[in-house]
Regions:
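Phosphate-binding P-loop
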Residues: 1-6
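Hydrophobic anchor at the beta1->P-loop junction of P-loop NTPases
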Residues: 9-11
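Rossmann-fold NAD(P)-dependent oxidoreductase module
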Residues: 29
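ATP-dependent small-molecule kinase phosphotransfer cores
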Residues: 33-100
Length: 100
């Protein structure tokens, strides 16, 4: 049985299509309606995920073996889910994510 009570909304799309803008607009709208909502993003979303993101973005983009890079991305996502998304959903919050 699913114990999650909250709602997860993600905005997806190519670069420059308005994902961040629409995420922020929806977040502001829900907050103004006093609806318990958080706004987060991927890649990143929590301190640990941001640290991994920064590791991946520094220097030569081809320095990582594809499998290593994939594992780092998955580690960042796991931290984001366990530290931000899952607790918010269990607390019956709406989670808006700029990409996922």
């Amino acid at each position: 049985m699913n114990n999650f009570k909250g709602t997860f909304i993600t905005f997806e799309g190519g670069e420059g299509t308005g994902k961040s803008t629409q995420s922020k607009l929806l977040y502001e709208y829900l907050i103004n309606k006093n609806i318990n909502t958080i706004l987060t993003r991927e890649p990143g979303g929590c301190l640990e995920s941001e640290e991994i993101r920064n590791i991946l973005l520094k220097g030569n983009l081809d320095k990582w073996d594809p499998i290593t890079e994939s594992l780092l991305h998955n580690a960042a996502r796991r931290e984001h889910i366990m530290k931000i998304i899952k607790p918010a959903l269990l607390a019956n919050k709406i989670v808006i994510c700029d990409r996922f």
